[in-house]
Amino acid sequence: MAKEKYDRSKPHVNIGTIGHVDHGKTTLTAAITTVLARRLPSAVNQPKDYASIDAAPEERERGITINTAHVEYETEKRHYAHIDAPGHADYVKNMITGAAQMDGAILVVASTDGPMPQTREHILLSRQVGVKHLIVFMNKIDLVDDEELLELVEMEIRDLLSEYDFPGDDLPVIQGSALKALEGDSKYEDIIMELMNTVDEYIPEPERDTEKPLLLPVEDVFSITGRGTVASGRIDRGTVRVNDEIEIVGIKEETQKAVVTGVEMFRKQLDEGLAGDNVGVLLRGVQRDEIERGQVIAKPGSINPHTKFKGEVYILTKEEGGRHTPFFNNYRPQFYFRTTDVTGSIELPAGTEMVMPGDNVTIDVELIHPIAVEQGTTFSIREGGRTVGSGMVTEIEA
């Protein structure tokens, strides 16, 4: 059977389910796909049962093993890619490595338990890695007879969200039962449809990569006699056109300006290169030795070189190929940003003596030379060429 063409007529949004273990994330994911398949049948809306989502295949993202289930479905307004990770460690890795780029998430809290330690941790991680829009699904309300108890649980969740700078008083809270909806109870199916309408309305459509300011990590540099210097790489975001003014950022203290005089892909001239394209960019006013791998070509003023930042990192276990021993304050590994390694020193949070393989921790990093970074930039931590950790910049310090 011929593969169906991907329908681009509907806006595409990435979401996921987050929350404490056994609060019903996977059951809710199954319920969403199943109820949508019943109510809005389409080629995309196929029911997925708990077992098929729970048996998520292992993926390797930057050397880290992560189990993640990817399902897709559509509402009348949008197409969704939805991620659900079975284990708590999978969530942490997913979010810190940026493997799971979520535009918004559904926080699942069992009404029988209320917020639990991982509820808190997932809210904090969402805040750290820039998932700005959360919707709460209070699950298992069929098991709670007391209306007042539900109100208390909702207040507790809202307070917890406010504590981490989410709009706790204002964000949507939907109460339902994923299991009852999955079993076909129409009252609870209606609630799943209400949840999806809320997701449609409350989670904004993400800015497309092509609409963001240009960022092109330089992978290779060569000169063409008589024409000038060419820098090549894959456009991370934005677009590049002939005659654009750009900046070359990173490695050196000074940011350098240049003008694009040509854009090529597969040896063909282009009017413009778009996010995702592998291009060569011909630059006027730049010598071959003034630009190098590890720098980025960017829209002027959009990104700056920095040496100090806070990061949220996950340290690989021995089984994942990571370190066998903990590390301590002032550990000096390499930080791999986009196309290059830079040595940096790590300062641990007050009260943290050491970091064990398998831990996640907030660290302060100081690099030996500046790199173009911003909040949300991901990196690997390497030792002698092997990955020992993965992280994301959460705050720029200098």
Swiss-Prot record:
PROSITE patterns on file: G_TR_1, G_TR_2
Localization per record: Cytoplasm
Catalysis: reaction(s): GTP + H2O = GDP + phosphate + H(+)
Annotated family: Belongs to the TRAFAC class translation factor GTPase superfamily. Classic translation factor GTPase family. EF-Tu/EF-1A subfamily.
Gene that encodes the chain: tuf
The organism's taxonomic lineage, starting at the top: Bacteria, Bacillati, Bacillota, Bacilli, Lactobacillales
Residue ranges of every copy of the tr-type G domain listed in the record: 10-207
Annotated positions binding GTP: 19-26, 84-88, 139-142
NCBIfam families attached to this UniProt entry: EF-Tu (TIGR00485), PRK00049.1 (NF000766), PRK12735.1 (NF009372), PRK12736.1 (NF009373), small_GTP (TIGR00231)
Protein name as catalogued: Elongation factor Tu
EC class (word): hydrolase
Sequence segments annotated as region (G2): 63-67
Signal peptide: none
Keywords (A to Z) from UniProt: Cytoplasm, Elongation factor, GTP-binding, Hydrolase, Magnesium, Metal-binding, Nucleotide-binding, Protein biosynthesis
Task of the protein: GTP hydrolase that promotes the GTP-dependent binding of aminoacyl-tRNA to the A-site of ribosomes during protein biosynthesis.
GO molecular function: GTP binding; GTPase activity; translation elongation factor activity
